[in-house]
Amino acid sequence: TPTYEPTIDDYRRRKKDEIARHDSSDEVNAFYMQGQRMWVDKATRAGLMLRLQAEQSMGKETTTLWYGSHQFELPMANAFQMLYVLELYASQCYDNTQRHLAAVDALESKEEIEAYDYRSGYPEELEF
């Protein structure tokens, strides 16, 4: 019986799966706050923004953010700025991942696909 030889589409699918795993990994989804490594997903960021807006509208000047059992007291302006910067970082990561997926679609050989480095182009992890 003949051995199965993966097609170029199989190689593409495999590389795109690697890219998707990398995109959702803590190699991409991480930042540091006061030395603590963490990540907050898009839904949590949206919820935090709503919370900050509500607190600010009630005249609060500081807010308390939690990550697990870690408490962070921040001036309201710093909390907003942190979320804006974090959202921009997440958008840059998303855009870079999409560029990698498009690049893999444009490659024309199994060897090119296999050798493609999808870890490049991501922004430096943020530190607050």
Predicted regions and their residues:
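A preference for well-ordered globular domain cores
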Residues: 1-128
